[in-house]
Amino acid sequence: MAETSLNLTDPNLATITSMRDLAAGIKLVQVRLDDPEERKRFVYEPGQFAEVSVFGVGESPFGLASSAERGDTLEFAVNKVGTVTEELFRLDVGDQVGIRGPLGHGFPMHEFKGKDILILGGGIGGAPLRPVIQTILDHRTDYGKLTILWAARSPDLLVFTEEYDLWTSEPNVTMHLTVDKATPDWQHDEGLITALIEKIKPSPENTITITCGPPIMIKFAMLTLEKVGFIPGQNWVTLEAKMKCGIGKCGRCNMGGVFICTEGPVFCFEKVSQFLESFV
């Protein structure tokens, strides 16, 4: 976890600076902490998250969707699926929210230097992977080949589509897209991300994999990666589905004695592989 002296139990005021459609039913919400000193202290790693409060309604955890190195705003991908997110959708630029964080542990990017990176993103699970991609691109010579596998149920649910050309314009970066159900004008793969893994057959040599998506996707992606030669110690996952309080108090994200919100949400799969059947 990045060093911070922020109060992790009380929210800090933040103002919405931008809201835009990211995909069908998903918005990208950008906020800036009101206190300049709090902004300076809000240092985080790719993969960490924060609790976003809608005052008078409640709070929910969201993965940070932008790199801390790219300015003093925070971005979150919000899927309209519950009371808090419905109220977030009603807010606009200039409205205030509360922010608690940064929370959890992120990806140890320093450990990945010199490695080839294979990224697997499913649906809105691509949002916490965007700062990973940004970090690799901003420090391109520190990392080897970057391969991105991006999946969604349908083309209109793919996130950050306007950035794909920018990502792949960088040296030694390739991207493969797949959807469960293609539209007539779809020009990429159709099917599950597991089929895409088997199709491109990524080499496990000197490679780290990073995966975020629905739990069922993570489960079968891990099985498929093993099938093509990867071992659990090469695979990193972020597990966000059951988090609530963010500080290990409510117990909702307890998985076999492991608290996802405090010990994760990022894990080397080697640590959580015994809970594979829980990934549903």
Language model: regions and residue ranges:
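Ferredoxin-reductase
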Residues: A2-D95, S154
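FNR/FR-type flavoprotein reductase catalytic core
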Residues: T83-K244
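Non-heme iron-sulfur electron-transfer modules
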Residues: G256-V280
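Short, charged beta-turn/beta-strand-edge "cap" motif at the junction between a beta-strand
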Residues: G56-G58, G101-G106, F279
